[in-house]
Amino acid sequence: MSVTSLIDTALDRSVVLGYGWPGLLVRKVLPDWPEGPGRMDGKVVLVTGAGSGVGLAAAVGFAGLGASVRVLGRSEQRAEEAAALTRKQAGDDVDVRPVVCDVSSLAALRNFTTRFLEEEDRLDVLVNNAGVMPDERQYSVDGVELTFATHVLAPWVLIEELTPLLARSAPSVVINVTSGGQYGQQLPAGDPESEETPYSPKKFYARTKRAQVVVTEKWAERLHDQGVHVHSMHPGWADTKGVRQWMPVFRAVTRPIIRTPAQGADTIVWLGAASEATENDGLFWHDRRPRPTTYPLAPGADSEEVREELWEYVSSLAHGERA
């Protein structure tokens, strides 16, 4: 292992330095820091959860590279605000359009994807970034636990429904934005929505982020031959509206080293534009490098039986059936 690899790995395993801005700054000066991202003129990018934080920063980054960006908000007002903020930060001459969908609703997702397929000629990058962390257990309009519906079911439906457009634009990239918190959880066997687990906002958030990583790998296997490359990534510790609202104590403790949203979004934008994303499939990225999905001292890898159970369960929900 090279010296630069040792430094990078040490930062990653330290968590505190690797997930904060010091890790990104150190990695950027290492000799093997990946180049790019390059220009994206003529390409179309769809970003969910684009109203603030990492999602907004990603939209700004893509627009700055020349991509046509669709910013998704759950209401017309939120989508318009996201588009205005993107233009304000990226420049008035960028191509940014608001699109509307409550991603926790299956009907809304179907209506949105139907319209999107009718209105758009291509889709080069899909970024699934929308996230929630309710204080108490809540359910979507379809009766699905809200964190699961937003983080796991919604990306699943968007990928499935938009695959024809992604395949037509191949090579294309899907980026599921997850969290380093996924390292602390395993998927619960026989209980995908954690109905048998007392509700804990942080635990449910992390568990659904773990599920995102697993579903990403499953999609990557299925879509590779169509030229659609599916990846997951985590942004590290970024100073977002969600962190301020849902994790104020954590934010206060990590404030000296917490990343800006743009620093958190760096790998999202890079993956959307770099050849590394289309040369690989199903990887879990942080700071422009693939990372392990488990660590020695963290909960172990999920069994193939549990992984397949999750896939079948989400598929059944997406198609209006309970497994």
Where are the regions a protein language model picked out?
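Catalytic loop of short-chain dehydrogenase/reductase
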Residues: 36, 131-148, 167-226, 234-252
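Conserved glycine-rich cofactor-binding loop
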Residues: 44, 51-53
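Conserved glycine-rich Rossmann-like NAD(P)H-binding loop of the short-chain dehydrogenase/reductase
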Residues: 65-81
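The beta1-alpha1 cofactor-binding region of Rossmann-like NAD(H)/NADP(H)-dependent oxidoreductases
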Residues: 76, 98-114
